[in-house]
């Protein structure tokens, strides 16, 4: 049975794991790393790069290198803040109002949804996992922030489908971390999972023990993460440079990309050192010449710059503990998740809020993927006696008279869940009702996130308040909502599976899947072309070396013929003309037998006449060490296959 891939699709980095021998195992990517940057780039030649390859060229190609796209997934353009738009690439409004990304692909402007960008990262993880395991991967469990709304969950599921994965389950990141932490725990524990990643913050309180994982409450902030710490450092660097030089770098994408990389390095370094020297030579220039940035950022200064960000984790944690029905003193373990939790100030804040020293036994970068793999094992039947009881993070409501949001399912309700309520008409002889659904905690409908709407018509004429309309909300195990409305008088029913107002339609998902499949073929073809070029290059090198070694021992006409063929093949290689390379390689290989025969004949002739020039003389017998004759030089071994 093929394995289910557990994927932590992160804002900054992604990680994948599978169950092997009853244990979760993190899989390395094709570069040998255990995490993959969630970055996609498009080059001038139209090539698509994903992961480390995309990250490496970001400084030279900032406008076409997309990072942190998870912060856009399932969101409307109108919901974005100015801070969200402070990226070198272009964010545009799609016809349906979603936030999309516009880049230059081989000289042509193309627009992608965040789901499509995410699918490119997922497709790389899938391909790397298949290569590592030697089997086809078709199914996955993908994690999302606990505080993701319905639209964001649907968008993540769509990204998996585009990548060619059947998404067996969408699981909350803190819940996945708790699974990995507590799989072998027998005694009951109350644990708090404090998850601060690249783009989102989650806090969950769970009761675990003897295979039961019950989420008591979840809270968080989907717009708070490591990117915000980076931005605080970036803004400080830009401000300091402006004070010194009078120049504003905020509208120079190339400079911003370099500053972003340096800001990220500074943030990481300051988790283990007290100060970091920021050095960015030739960052820009004016009439007086080139300008450089040379600054020192201390840990206390970083903590001062980001104090307000860290403080934003306080309320969700306290609210979550209160909603769980526990007190701070009832928390037995504090599990830290996400790269940002390596920062001493973050650890101290988590410790203060939860009243516990952080648990040190989990890797914050890998624990979520391991939990996703365990959930995959549960779904496949490889992991037994595990019961996972998660909750819906936000209240789900319908609009009633006066624009009120009337709750159908309260936040922190255990899922899956199904709830029904009976409503009526607001006017006499009303022939239809509009069912509008939202997600959020505000009292007025318009202040919450609109998820979708549909119409139930054909209601029999009757005075206001007489018709009975039963509305049912059904949340599945993925946390995705299905809504139905039924006229109890006529039996007429209307249903909607909320795709989220920021989701892709089925047709759009299918189109994106076809594009992804075509790109997979394209990638395969490109890899084959590169292999052909490398083989030809290696062949030229090998033949040239043999010609040189043989010297004048070869017939002149054969030597000239082969030299001509090598020259033609090298020209084709330099032009990357694959058709010409294949023909030239075939042509050259057809004459190699003649070359080998001539070489053999020359060697036999040389053997009869004594050693060939450059050949080692036969060793004389000796009873002990001899003094070396001539010069002794360092030897180099050349591997013809490389």
From Swiss-Prot:
Q: Give the induction annotation.
A: By stress conditions e.g. heat shock.
Extract the ranges annotated as region (Disordered).
600-642
Arranged from A to Z, the UniProt key words for this protein are: ATP-binding, Chaperone, Nucleotide-binding, Phosphoprotein, Stress response
Q: Name one Pfam family in it.
A: HSP70
Transmembrane region(s): none
Q: Which GO terms describe its molecular function?
A: ATP binding; ATP-dependent protein folding chaperone; unfolded protein binding
List, alphabetically, the SUPFAM superfamilies matched.
Actin-like ATPase domain, Heat shock protein 70kD (HSP70), peptide-binding domain
Spans of biased composition, class Basic and acidic residues?
623-634
Q: Which PROSITE patterns has this protein been placed in?
A: HSP70_1, HSP70_2, HSP70_3
Modified residue annotations for Phosphothreonine: 200
Feature: compositional bias, Low complexity: 600-616
**Protein origin, superkingdom:** Bacteria
List the disulfide bonds in this chain: none
Tell me which family the UniProt entry assigns to this protein.
Belongs to the heat shock protein 70 family.
Q: What does this protein do?
A: Acts as a chaperone.
| Annotated protein name in UniProt | Chaperone protein DnaK
Where does this protein come from, organism-wise?
Akkermansia muciniphila (strain ATCC BAA-835 / DSM 22959 / JCM 33894 / BCRC 81048 / CCUG 64013 / CIP 107961 / Muc)
């Amino acid at each position: 049975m093929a394995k289910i891939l557990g994927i932590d699709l992160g804002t900054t980095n992604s990680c994948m794991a599978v169950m092997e021998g009853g244990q979760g195992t993190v899989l390395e990517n094709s570069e040998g790393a255990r995490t993959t940057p969630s970055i996609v780039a498009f080059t001038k030649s139209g090539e698509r790069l994903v992961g480390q390859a995309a990250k490496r060229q970001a400084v030279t190609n900032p406008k076409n290198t997309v990072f942190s796209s998870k912060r856009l997934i399932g969101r409307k353009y109108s919901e974005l803040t100015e801070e969200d738009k402070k990226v070198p690439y272009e964010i545009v409004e799609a016809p349906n109002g979603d936030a999309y990304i516009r880049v230059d692909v081989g000289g042509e402007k193309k627009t992608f949804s965040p789901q499509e960008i995410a699918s490119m990262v997922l497709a790389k993880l899938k391909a790397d996992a298949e290569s590592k395991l030697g089997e086809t991967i078709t199914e996955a469990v993908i994690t999302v922030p606990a505080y993701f709304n319905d639209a964001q969950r649907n968008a993540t599921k769509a990204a998996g489908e585009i990548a060619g994965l059947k998404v067996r389950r969408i699981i909350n990141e803190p819940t996945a971390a708790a699974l990995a932490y507590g799989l072998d725990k027998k005694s009951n524990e109350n644990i708090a999972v404090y998850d601060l990643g690249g783009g989102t913050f989650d806090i969950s309180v769970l009761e675990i023990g003897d295979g039961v994982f019950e989420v008591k409450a979840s809270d968080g902030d989907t717009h708070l993460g490591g990117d915000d710490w980076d931005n605080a450092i970036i803004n400080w660097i830009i401000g300091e440079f402006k004070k010194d030089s009078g120049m504003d770098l905020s509208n120079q994408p190339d400079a911003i990309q370099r500053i972003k990389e340096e800001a990220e390095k500074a943030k990481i370094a300051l988790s283990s050192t007290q100060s970091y020297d920021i050095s960015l030579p030739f960052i820009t220039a004016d009439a007086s010449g080139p300008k450089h940035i040379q600054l020192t950022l201390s840990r206390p200064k970083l903590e001062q710059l980001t104090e307000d960000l860290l403080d934003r984790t306080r309320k969700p944690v306290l609210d979550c503990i209160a909603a769980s029905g526990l007190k701070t003193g009832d928390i037995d373990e504090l599990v830290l998740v996400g790269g940002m939790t390596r920062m001493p100030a973050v650890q101290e804040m988590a410790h203060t809020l939860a009243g516990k020293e952080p648990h040190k036994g989990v890797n914050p970068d890998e624990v979520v993927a391991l939990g996703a793999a365990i959930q995959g094992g549960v779904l496949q039947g490889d992991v037994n006696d595990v019961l996972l009881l998660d909750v819906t993070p936000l209240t789900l409501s319908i609009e009633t008279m006066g624009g009120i949001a009337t709750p159908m399912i309260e936040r922190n309700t255990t899922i899956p869940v199904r709830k029904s309520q009976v409503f009526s008409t607001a006017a006499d002889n009303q022939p239809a009702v509009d069912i509008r659904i939202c997600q959020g905690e505000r009292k007025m409908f318009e202040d919450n996130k609109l998820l979708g709407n549909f119409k139930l018509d054909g209601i029999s004429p009757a005075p206001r308040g007489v018709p009975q309309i039963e509305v049912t909300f059904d949340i599945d195990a993925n946390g995705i909502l299905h809504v139905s409305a039924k006229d109890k008088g006529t039996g007429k029913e209307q249903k909607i599976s909320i795709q989220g107002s920021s989701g892709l339609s089925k047709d759009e998902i299918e189109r994106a899947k076809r594009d992804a499949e075509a790109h997979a073929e394209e990638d395969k073809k490109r890899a084959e072309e590169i292999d052909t070029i490398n083989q030809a290059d290696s062949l030229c090198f090998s033949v040239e070396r043999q010609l040189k070694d043989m010297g004048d021992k070869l017939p002149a006409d054969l030597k000239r013929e082969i030299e001509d063929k090598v020259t033609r093949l090298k020209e084709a290689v330099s032009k990357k003309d694959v058709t010409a390379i294949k023909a030239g390689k075939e042509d050259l290989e057809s004459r190699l037998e003649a070359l080998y025969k001539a070489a053999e004949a020359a060697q036999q002739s040389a053997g009869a006449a004594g050693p060939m020039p450059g050949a080692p003389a036969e060793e004389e017998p000796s009873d002990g060490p001899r003094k070396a004759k001539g010069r002794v030089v360092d030897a180099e071994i050349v591997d013809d296959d490389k």
